[in-house]
Amino acid sequence: MTTFPFAPSWLDELPARLAELDAVHLRRRRRTVRPLQGAHLDVDGQPMLAFCSNDYLGLAGHPALADAACAGAREFGVGSGGSPLVSGHSQANAALEADLARFVQLPRALYFYAGYATNTGIVPALVGAGDALFSDALNHACLIDGARLSRATIHRYPHGDLAALEALLAASPARRKLVVSDAVFSMDGDVADIRTLHALCERHDALLLLDDAHGFGVLGPQGRGALAEAGLTGQRASQRVLYMATLGKAAGAAGAFVAGSEVLIEWLLQKTRSYIFATAAPALLARTLQASLGLIERGDALRAHLDARIAQLRAGLVPVLQGTHWELGTSRTAVQALVIGANDEALAAMEALRARGLWVPAIRPPTVPEGTARLRIALSAAHTEADVARLVDALADIAPTARSALPQEAAA
C-alpha cells in the first residue's frame, strides 16, 4: 500500500498560487494595530491617522464600554461555557436581546456572536430547495454565502435596480420568496431604497431580510438604523421584514443580532445552525453592548459631528478630483468610495498616503467588481476637522499622479 508521509501533494501548488495573487496585486496582508488616541493608531510600529475603521461613532475606546466590560467579567466571568440552547444564554444576553428589540422597535431580537455567522445561518433557516431568493448584485459576502448554503434558486438583480427585482418577483412561481439586501452597501456607502423594497415584498408576498451593518447606530432617529429612517417600525414592519445589524461597527464592540416578529425569531432560534451549534458570546460583551446602546441613543451630537465630517470631505475633494479619472461615489454615509480603477494604482495611492502617515485601505476584486479598485474612506465621529483636512490635502498631493496617467486631451 502506498503511503504519503509528508504533506498532501496538492499543497505544493500553493506557493505558485500565492505568487499569482502577488502578480495581479491581490494578496492581502494583515497589519498589527494598537490604539493611540481618537482616530490615531500604531500600525506595524508606525503612528497613523486611520480612515479605515468601521467604529463610526468612536465608541470602541469609550471608557463607559470598558467599565461595563470589566463589571460584566466580574459578574459573569469571561466565557459563556456553552451554546445558547444548552448553558450559554446568560441573564445579560437575555437582557441585551430585550434592549435591542426595544431599540429597533421590533417585537423580538436574537443575539449572535458574529455578523457573518448570522447571515450565513439565518438565510438557510428561511429558504431552501424549491424556494426563491432575490439578491442585490452588490450584497455583502455573508448574504451571498448564506444564499448559496440555502440551496434556494438565486435570482441576482443589478445593483439598486428595483424594476428588475419586481420583474423577477412577478415571474417567480415559488411559494416562498426571500429578498435579501444590504441597507448600506459596505463598499460604496449608498443606502438601499428600503420603502420600495418593502412595498415590492408586500405586493409579491415576499419576506425582506435587511442587513444594516453600516447603518445601525448612525442612521435614523437616535441611531435606530436604516429601517427606522425609512419609517418602518413596529407591527407593520415585523410582518414583512427581518432586520439584521452588527454590533462591532457603530456600537463599538462585537456581535450581531436579528430582529422581527415573535414567531419568526422563534423559528430562527430553533433552526439556525450557526446559533444552535456555536458557543454563545460571553456575558461581559452583552453588558458592554447595553452600555453602548445608551450612548447611541443619546448620541445625536456624535452623529451631527460625523455628518459634518462627511460633508467636509465631499466638499474638499471636488476641486482635488477635477481633471482626474478618480471618482468619488454619491454616498451620504460614513463609507466614502474613491474609485481609482486599476489594482496597482489603488495600491500605489494607498502606499503614498501611508508615507504621509494616513491609513486608507485599497479595496480590490473580488471584494469589488473588476476595474473598480478603490480607496475606501471610512469616517468616524472620532475624526476632527483637522484630521479630514489633512486627508484632503494628502489626496491633493497625490492626485497629479492620476492626472499624468490620463491621455493629454483628458487631462487638459
Swiss-Prot record:
Q: Name one GO molecular function term.
A: 8-amino-7-oxononanoate synthase activity
Q: Name one GO biological process term.
A: biotin biosynthetic process
Which key words tag this protein in UniProt? Answer: Biotin biosynthesis, Pyridoxal phosphate, Transferase
> Could you say which EC number(s) this protein's record lists?
2.3.1.47
| NCBIfam families, per database record | bioF (TIGR00858)
| Subunit and interaction comment | Homodimer.
Q: What is this protein called?
A: 8-amino-7-oxononanoate synthase
**UniProt source species:** Paracidovorax citrulli (strain AAC00-1)
